[in-house]
Amino acid sequence: MYDTIVIGAGQAGISIGYYLKQSDQKFIILDKSHEVGESWKDRYDSLVLFTSRMYSSLPGMHLEGEKHGFPSKNEIVAYLKKYVKKFEIPIQLRTEVISVLKIKNYFLIKTNREEYQTKNLVIATGPFHTPNIPSISKDLSDNINQLHSSQYKNSKQLAYGNVLVVGGGNSGAQIAVELSKERVTYLACSNKLVYFPLMIGKRSIFWWFDKLGVLHASHTSIVGKFIQKKGDPVFGHELKHAIKQKEIILKKRVIAAKQNEIIFKDSSTLEVNNIIWATGFRNPLCWINIKGVLDQEGRIIHHRGVSPVEGLYFIGLPWQHKRGSALLQGVGNDAEYIVKQMNGE
């Protein structure tokens, strides 16, 4: 019987592990990956974080390098591995959770390896779990090369011809800019694009967000509600420049598909050769067989990561408490709070 089991060894789960190591708890982190940092390693080759190194560290250990510079995905992978080794955080890899049950005052976790029992359970699988691909993708011809942004590594995966990137978030923006240098590239967005600079006066924009209190705005505050309503901006002006130079052709929201053709909200159409769905992720928790975890719309019920189900906690959710909860730097604050709640502090 463990005191605590954490499911997920990404930055959120590792942050929980950091604070659990400072307590007397017997705990372990389970993850289906083959190595620490695998979810970062599997992202596209050119991925660079839009948060500076100063805001890309977990508690207790800074990310090395120029603090206002922007780390690559490989830096983050190496950092996470070094972090786990330094703090001797117990992780069992290649362990996929099949189901979770609540039996009286403990949780029963069934995996592909064995069963585990624990008094406390922390779900740290995060929001980037299962690719969210629109159902209209099934209406396209098999001749169309389709990838989700989580599957995209580089342009070598694409077939000859044009590419449509669907989704105007930061991943979609970076991928579209990269591909526009070698082929005809379209970008379909549901909303008007808003751009923020990466740097202001030789400092990362997140330094300014920090000083202005934006990173510390709770999800229930006036500032927090405003930011959530507006959504995240595109950081950097590379996309804006590429659109202005007509290197990327901006399209309206995708509403339908038929064989080789995509139909947009303004009724225009486009014959495509490749599509990259930069349409985000969903986090299905069908393996948690416990009443009271989700509301009627399938959303996680929690207050700052604490579930109404006794002993159950969540970490790594967008806006779990503050704007900064989604950042490497911010997840540590949520982890510290959860472990304190767990210990009755």
Curated annotation (Swiss-Prot):
Q: How does it sit in the membrane?
A: Peripheral membrane protein
Subcellular localization, per the record?
Answer: Cell membrane
EC numbers listed for it are 1.-.-.-
Question: Could you tell me the keywords of this UniProt record?
Answer: Cadmium, Cell membrane, Cobalt, Cobalt transport, Ion transport, Membrane, Oxidoreductase, Potassium, Potassium transport, Transport, Zinc, Zinc transport
**One GO MF term:** flavin adenine dinucleotide binding
Query: Mind telling me which GO cellular component terms the entry cites?
Result: plasma membrane
Q: Does the keyword Transmembrane apply?
A: no
GO biological process terms, semicolon-separated: cobalt ion transport; potassium ion transport; zinc ion transport
Name the domain of life: Bacteria
- Enzyme's top EC category: oxidoreductase
Briefly state the protein's biological role: Involved in potassium and divalent cation transport. Enhances the transport activity of the cation/potassium transporter CzcD.
UniProt-listed PANTHER family: FLAVIN-BINDING MONOOXYGENASE-LIKE PROTEIN (AFU_ORTHOLOGUE AFUA_4G09220), FLAVIN-CONTAINING MONOOXYGENASE
Stated name of the protein = Uncharacterized oxidoreductase CzcO
Question: Which organism does this record belong to?
Answer: Bacillus subtilis (strain 168)
Ranked from the top, the taxonomy reads: Bacteria, Bacillati, Bacillota, Bacilli, Bacillales
